[in-house]
């Protein structure tokens, strides 16, 4: 290149061009790309006045305007990227420069839209005001009970007949399209309306569309003339029927969450009952158990009516000594039958309190736990169990490996934030094994904690409900614990839950037997069906391959009719669940959770259905470390197999599109879209299997609370605690303070009206943000520190409301990014024998994505550049 430029260009220009070429090479560009980049630069200088001030402003804003194009490392097709991005920017700039009449028209539309949203927001209050008289007087109150039942029966009968006609009426494609547009229009109108009416209306619309779909599938889409198509079609129909049943039961379960609030306790503390607190442990480290015991010691309850027990199934001397030192009771069994359930039942022989509260050994209760829960027991004598959420202050494997901790609701948020609240409406709250209070009398009547299944908690609540006792759920977190540290441990825990729920289904089926109300039966069945999702999920992940590889018509219908039935079913279900579950489960994330677990829960649930007594109990490990980032190849092996299988389907689909019958082209396209969606979800599952580093033994909890620090010379400075752990704190000093790294200071924290002092050492200083390391504490100081931090009554209450609102399209984009991230990890960590395949695939996707225009990264100087760009 230097010889050619020396011959064509004058020395100063040649030297500058050679310098630019070397700069490109230094930043990683290939020789070809660097040479081509220099050539494009020469053409730009010839045809574009780059020295003009407007072009200079654009060049200064290059990173903001062209964020995906690296000016220091050119690529061969960068001019195409510049052209696409420039057109994108010009379209955006022209929108801002619209003529005044258009701007006024647009403003008018915005005004109409704003008034519509305001009207929708005010509608529930208006309806409530107009119908207030109905709350004071029943319209049919003058009729006898029999007449009212007759009228209600007639209304229900006619409603069912109309629903049946609506579901079963056959439509041609045009009529089906018009019908769907009407329903979709209604859904768009009511979805922004606050209150429960809009959710109920969306449920009705979703059920209408989904029931029409499942009716159409059973009556019009099976190919009875082709055995292969029939078998594959029936397998898919089985999975879809399962999904439809779970959808219907799920709507029923959460249609009206109760949102129970605390009941005040009597002022006379002599009326407060006695409570035993059980903390069962088996193989956990003492450091995991200490915080739970320390927090239990600080629970606001009369000390003469509170007994704390360590139930040590490991029989360890250090635990017995610890219990003696802090003044709690200790029980160790000589035999270990029935695992945790047997451990608790053994302790029930010694505890004599009127109530028993159970905490897993890593669940730290707040000081207000009993005061928030016990009032309901005094109000309702038939109440046997009160459950509170399982809240976790450490990230679970999904949150940690994907970097989503406190950014996206975790896997358990839906159950503890919404499902249990919905169960409470139907008096079907499940006992979850921890963070709960149980009345001793009903517990003794059923023989203690159930031992026949490995999910003793749910089985115990089922037995209590069969006896006619009630249960309750309070959504306010009153304890927090450690999430599982690795994906393998997380999957092991879910396997146990899945097998246990299927065992209950076989051994004590809630659909049969006495004592349960109809609504309770449905709630229990839905919980058990949830854990049978493994096989249906695997079917969905492989179903389109039946057509691409086996030429089996799994849905024997024209592609247009498939689109007119399948897409509305999926869209309405997604829209409705986003409205109902948005705070607790973002759209499309259920696909990731179920895909990760599907392969592993399918075999044990199938075995439990056949032989419910087969299997063993496993204990979930807590408090471990992940010292290096790595791919769990054992766990991810099934996902990789499914990825490869779907890639084969893609290859065959491409061949069939170009060389297959023209009449099948649209069906091939539909199947390929399904395969690509499955590949995205499987890529997300692979991304979860990449274990991120976890090198902290003490997890940091982000929380703001006032504090103060005192230097050794007596100077006192106010500060705000930003995060804390069992080993230290992060604080922000209010104002100026001379704090040096390594300096010893005292930290002052308040609990109620009492102030506590803790010795610390400054570990780091960054401006007014300071990291403090706790110095060795006495036992009493450690108890006080836990009660001032982890056990504060307000520590966890606001976490559930901190998640952003669900936006389905943004959530879909997150899943797309997550899937691509999984394949990048495969390319990075894969063995050399297959690394090349994934590198080629990820490079190909990255290359295609690099041409997509980006939204400019705004800065204060970006606006003039946009205007300059529009004027060129």
Swiss-Prot record:
Its EC number is 2.4.1.12. Induction: Part of the yhjR-bcsQABZC operon. Expressed at low levels in mid-log phase, expression increases as cells enter stationary phase, the increase in stationary phase is dependent on rpoS. Expression is higher at 28 than 37 degrees Celsius (at protein level). This is Cellulose synthase catalytic subunit [UDP-forming]. The genes bscA, bcsB, bcsZ and bcsC are constitutively transcribed but cellulose synthesis occurs only when DgcC, a putative transmembrane protein regulated by CsgD, is expressed. Cellulose production is abolished in E.coli K12 / MG1655 and W3110 due to a premature stop codon in bcsQ. Residues 441-501 are annotated as: Catalytic subdomain B. Disruption phenotype: When disrupted in a cellulose-synthesizing strain (a strain K12 / W3110 derivative called AR3110 with a restored, functional bcsQ gene), cellulose is no longer made and the rdar morphotype is lost. The chain crosses the membrane at residues 30-50, 151-171, 173-193, 230-250, 525-545, 547-567, 592-612, 640-660, 668-688, 833-853. Residues 271-364 are annotated as: Catalytic subdomain A. One of its GO terms (biological process) is bacterial cellulose biosynthetic process. InterPro entries: Cell_synth_A, Glyco_trans_2-like, Glycosyltr_2/OpgH_subfam, Nucleotide-diphossugar_trans, PilZ_domain. Activated by bis-(3'-5') cyclic diguanylic acid (c-di-GMP). Its main location: membrane. PANTHER family: CELLULOSE SYNTHASE CATALYTIC SUBUNIT A [UDP-FORMING] (PTHR43867:SF2). The lineage of its organism: Bacteria, Pseudomonadati, Pseudomonadota, Gammaproteobacteria, Enterobacterales. Its cofactor is Mg(2+). Signal peptide: none annotated. It catalyses: [(1->4)-beta-D-glucosyl](n) + UDP-alpha-D-glucose = [(1->4)-beta-D-glucosyl](n+1) + UDP + H(+). Keywords: c-di-GMP, Cell inner membrane, Cell membrane, Cellulose biosynthesis, Glycosyltransferase, Membrane, Transferase, Transmembrane, Transmembrane helix. It comes from Escherichia coli (strain K12). There are two conserved domains in the globular part of the protein: the N-terminal domain (domain A) contains the conserved DXD motif and is possibly involved in catalysis and substrate binding. The C-terminal domain (domain B) contains the QXXRW motif and is present only in processive glycosyl transferases. It could be involved in the processivity function of the enzyme, possibly required for holding the growing glycan chain in the active site.
């Amino acid at each position: 290149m230097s010889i050619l430029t020396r011959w064509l260009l004058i020395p100063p220009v040649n030297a500058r061009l050679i310098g630019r070429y070397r700069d490109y090479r230094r930043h990683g560009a290939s020789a070809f790309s660097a040479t081509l980049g220099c050539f494009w630069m020469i053409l730009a200088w010839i045809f574009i006045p780059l020295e003009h001030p407007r072009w200079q402003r654009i060049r200064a804003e290059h990173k903001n305007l062209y964020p995906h194009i690296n000016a220091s490392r050119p690529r061969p097709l960068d001019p195409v990227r510049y052209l696409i991005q420039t057109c994108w920017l010009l379209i955006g700039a022209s929108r801002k420069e619209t003529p005044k009449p258009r701007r006024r028209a647009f403003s008018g539309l915005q005004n109409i839209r704003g008034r519509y949203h305001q009207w929708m927001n005010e509608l529930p209050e208006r309806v409530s005001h107009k119908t207030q008289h109905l709350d004071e007087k029943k319209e049919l109150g003058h009729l006898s009970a029999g007449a009212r039942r007759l009228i209600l029966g007639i209304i229900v009968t006619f409603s069912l007949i109309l629903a049946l006609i609506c579901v079963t009426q056959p439509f041609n494609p045009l009529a089906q399209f018009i019908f769907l547009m009407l329903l979709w229009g209604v859904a768009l109108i009511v979805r922004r309306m606050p209150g429960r009416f809009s959710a109920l209306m969306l449920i009705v619309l979703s059920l209408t569309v989904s029931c029409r779909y499942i009716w159409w599938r059973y009556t019009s889409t099976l190919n009875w003339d082709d055995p292969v198509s029939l078998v594959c079609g029936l397998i898919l129909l089985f999975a879809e029927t399962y999904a439809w049943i779970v959808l219907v039961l799920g709507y029923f379960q959460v249609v009206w969450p109760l949102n129970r609030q605390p009941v005040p306790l009597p002022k006379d503390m002599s009326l407060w009952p006695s409570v035993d607190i059980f903390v069962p442990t088996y193989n956990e480290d003492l450091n995991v158990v200490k915080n739970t015991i320390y927090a239990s010691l600080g629970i606001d309850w009369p000390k003469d009516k509170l007994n704390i027990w360590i139930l040590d199934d490991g029989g360890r001397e250090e635990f017995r000594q610890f219990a003696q030192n802090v003044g709690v009771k200790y029980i160790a069994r000589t035999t270990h039958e029935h695992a945790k359930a047997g451990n608790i039942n053994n302790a029930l022989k010694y505890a004599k309190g009127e109530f028993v509260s159970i905490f897993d050994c890593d669940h730290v209760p707040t000081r207000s736990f009993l005061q928030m829960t016990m009032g309901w027991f005094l109000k309702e004598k038939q109440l046997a169990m009160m459950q509170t959420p399982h809240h976790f202050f450490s990230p679970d494997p999904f949150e940690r490996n994907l970097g989503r901790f406190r950014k996206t609701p975790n896997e358990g948020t839906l159950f503890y934030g919404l499902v249990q609240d919905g169960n409470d409406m139907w008096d079907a709250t499940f006992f979850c094994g921890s963070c709960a209070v149980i009345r001793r009398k009903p517990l003794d009547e059923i023989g203690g904690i159930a031992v026949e299944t490995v999910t003793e908690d749910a089985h115990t609540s089922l037995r209590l409900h069969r006896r006619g006792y009630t249960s309750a759920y309070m959504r306010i977190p009153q304890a927090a614990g450690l999430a599982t540290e690795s994906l393998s441990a997380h999957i092991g825990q879910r396997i146990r839950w899945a097998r246990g729920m299927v065992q209950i289904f076989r051994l004590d089926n809630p659909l049969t037997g006495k004592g349960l109300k109809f609504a309770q039966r449905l709630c229990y069945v839905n919980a058990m069906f949830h854990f049978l999702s493994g096989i249906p999920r695997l079917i969905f992940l492989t179903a389109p391959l039946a057509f691409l590889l086996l030429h089996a018509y799994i849905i024997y219908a024209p592609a247009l009719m498939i689109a007119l039935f399948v897409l509305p079913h999926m869209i309405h279900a997604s829209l409705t669940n986003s409205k109902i579950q948005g705070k607790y489960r973002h759209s499309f994330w259920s696909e990731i959770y179920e895909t990760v677990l599907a392969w592993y829960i399918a075999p044990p649930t199938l075995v439990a259905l056949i032989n419910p007594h087969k299997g063993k109990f496993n204990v979930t490990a807590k408090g471990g470390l992940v010292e290096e980032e790595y791919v769990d190849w054992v766990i991810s092996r099934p996902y990789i197999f499914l990825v490869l299988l779907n890639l084969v389907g893609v290859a065959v689909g491409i061949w069939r599109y170009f060389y297959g019958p023209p009449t099948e082209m649209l069906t091939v396209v539909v199947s390929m879209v399904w395969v690509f969606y499955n590949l995205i979800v499987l890529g997300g599952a692979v991304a979860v299997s990449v274990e991120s580093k976890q090198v902290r033994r003490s997890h940091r909890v982000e929380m703001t609370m006032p504090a103060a620090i005192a230097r050794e010379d007596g100077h006192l400075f106010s500060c705000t605690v930003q995060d804390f752990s069992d080993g230290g704190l992060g604080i922000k000093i209010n104002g100026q303070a001379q704090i040096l790294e390594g300096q010893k200071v005292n930290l002052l924290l308040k609990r109620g009206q009492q102030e506590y002092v803790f010795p610390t050492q400054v570990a780091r200083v960054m401006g007014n943000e300071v990291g403090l390391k706790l110095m060795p504490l006495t036992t009493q100081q450690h108890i006080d520190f836990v009660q001032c931090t982890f056990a504060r009554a307000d520590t966890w209450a606001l976490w559930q409301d901190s998640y952003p609102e669900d936006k389905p399209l943004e959530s879909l984009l997150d899943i797309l990014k997550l899937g691509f991230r999984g394949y990048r990890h495969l390319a990075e960590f894969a063995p050399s024998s297959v690394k090349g395949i994934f590198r080629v695939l990820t490079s190909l996707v990255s290359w295609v994505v690099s041409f997509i225009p980006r939204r400019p990264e705004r800065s204060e100087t970006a606006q003039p550049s946009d205007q300059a760009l529009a004027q060129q």
